[in-house]
Amino acid sequence: MVDKRESYTKEDLLASSRGELFGPQGPQLPAPNMLMMDRVVKMTEDGGKYGKGYVEAELDITPDLWFFGCHFIGDPVMPGCLGLDAMWQLVGFYLGWLGGEGKGRALGVGEVKFTGQVLPTAKKVTYRIHFKRVINRRLVMGIADGEVLVDGQQIYTADELKVGLFKDTSSF
């Protein structure tokens, strides 16, 4: 039985990274340091811009986060690719929440725009994922648009985020 709540704590997300949240066949989130959220604050099957599902999650920003020490020395900024990866993570998490099974793999993105940055002085990053379609056949795949906000201001958008769940990744 899938653990289908509307919100999840950091402990829940860590359980997902160990394969304990959505069962032994469900997709896993990455473990820290690659886990790019502290909590999921909202999940619905019928919300979002397209009425086909919505996920909202948050990451607390502190100056001691690992990436600020190396990207870049003297000019610390969160790598934009980590925000993109967080959106892919949330698409896969949603597929597990729906009961999908398999190993999650990012399959692509249509267009990404960066119009701002996450600095060590920020307080919170918010991720919003708006599902356009979920395909549940031999391949389970989610297609969604996403946005990243820092302290309430939109700084990234991504169209056509795609994540698939694979029962066998040996030929992927």
Swiss-Prot record:
Pathways per UniProt: Lipid metabolism; fatty acid biosynthesis
Pfam families: FabA
Entry keyword annotation includes Magnesium: no
The EC number(s) this enzyme carries: 4.2.1.59, 5.3.3.14
Catalytic activity: a (3R)-hydroxyacyl-[ACP] = a (2E)-enoyl-[ACP] + H2O; (3R)-hydroxydecanoyl-[ACP] = (2E)-decenoyl-[ACP] + H2O; (2E)-decenoyl-[ACP] = (3Z)-decenoyl-[ACP]
Gene Ontology cellular-component terms listed: cytoplasm
Protein function: Necessary for the introduction of cis unsaturation into fatty acids. Catalyzes the dehydration of (3R)-3-hydroxydecanoyl-ACP to E-(2)-decenoyl-ACP and then its isomerization to Z-(3)-decenoyl-ACP. Can catalyze the dehydratase reaction for beta-hydroxyacyl-ACPs with saturated chain lengths up to 16:0, being most active on intermediate chain length.
Protein name per its UniProtKB record: 3-hydroxydecanoyl-[acyl-carrier-protein] dehydratase
Species in which this protein is naturally found: Pectobacterium carotovorum subsp. carotovorum (strain PC1)
